[in-house]
């Protein structure tokens, strides 16, 4: 009996050693370009996939370069969800694909009603002449969510029902954001605002606003352009100057001082997309938060 127990213990020790030395299964990884896309993807995949984001908090997506660690993870990723028109995407997506031949790239702006640059801010031209900031629109966000879900169903069809069920919940959340923002902005008398980087074109279109960009041709404004913005703000009785947290606040403060308007810091690239959309509406409507 004693010999049997010793043998059993020995086998147990050997098995434990074998399993502890075995390679753990890797996380199932997908990548997204920016944090708002990560929010949507997290809602759809739950904890079944690890969602990595390329552009970290507080960094602009126009000229970002992925880190070596990100490139390693991209080599293990199953899918990449892009906006399709961000500066760094144009420079890096082909490199991502060459790093990982099995990487499937999904463009989340597919079937979104895109804004051509000359429609709203001709002085700021992005690549391919398209305003890429589609996530600033709750209406476009519905299509973004659908595109992410469709991509997940394609790469993981066995879990299609799970993804579609989560999509329904996410769409309900997006609709609630849309309703809240509509209510907050319904009676705002002045439908114009100044913004440093024109990231709210789709938001402005959805809710009947006009955005005036401080940036000129994607660069820090010249004194001449700054004066033009100031004169427009004065003549249009514009009350707010919006600036994203990743940009220098100095030029926004100059305009605010000259026009008597108020500087408002926003973060449309933040992960918590619903809160950011509602916060922007609250600030534009002067509703206490």
Task: Label each region the model flagged.
Residues 7-16:
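Bacterial N-terminal signal peptides
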Residues 6-7, 248:
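Short amphipathic alpha-helical "recognition" segments used for binding
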Residues 17-289:
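Extracytoplasmic metal-acquisition and chelation regions
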Residues 1-4:
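Positively charged n-region of N-terminal signal peptides that target proteins for export
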């Amino acid at each position: 009996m004693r010999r049997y127990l010793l043998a059993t213990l020995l086998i147990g020790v050997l098995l434990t050693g074998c399993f502890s030395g075995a390679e753990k299964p890797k996380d199932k990884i997908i990548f997204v370009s920016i944090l708002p896309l990560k929010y949507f993807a997290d809602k759809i995949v739950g904890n079944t996939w690890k969602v990595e984001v390329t552009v970290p908090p507080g960094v602009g997506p126009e000229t970002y370069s992925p880190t070596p660690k990100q490139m390693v993870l991209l080599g293990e990723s199953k899918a990449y969800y892009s906006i399709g028109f961000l500066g760094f995407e144009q420079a890096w997506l082909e490199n991502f694909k060459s790093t990982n031949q099995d990487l499937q790239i999904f463009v989340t702006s597919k079937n979104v009603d895109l804004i051509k640059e000359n429609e709203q801010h001709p002085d700021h031209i992005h690549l391919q002449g398209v305003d890429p900031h589609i996530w600033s629109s709750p209406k476009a966000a519905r299509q973004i969510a659908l595109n992410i879900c469709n991509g997940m169903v394609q790469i993981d069809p066995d879990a299609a029902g799970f993804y579609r069920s989560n999509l329904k919940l996410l769409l309900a959340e997006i609709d609630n954001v849309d309703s809240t923002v509509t209510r907050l902005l319904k009676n705002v008398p002045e439908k114009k605002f100044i913004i440093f980087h024109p990231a709210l074109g789709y938001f402005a279109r959805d809710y009947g606003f006009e955005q005036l960009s401080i940036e000129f041709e994607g660069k820090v404004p010249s004194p001449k352009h700054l004066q033009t913005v100031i004169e427009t703000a004065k003549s249009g009785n514009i009350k707010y100057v919006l600036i994203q947290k990743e940009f220098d606040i100095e030029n926004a403060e100059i305009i605010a001082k000259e026009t008597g308007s108020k500087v408002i810091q926003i973060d449309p690239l933040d992960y918590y997309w619903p809160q950011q959309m509602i916060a922007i509406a609250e600030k534009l409507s002067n509703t206490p938060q």
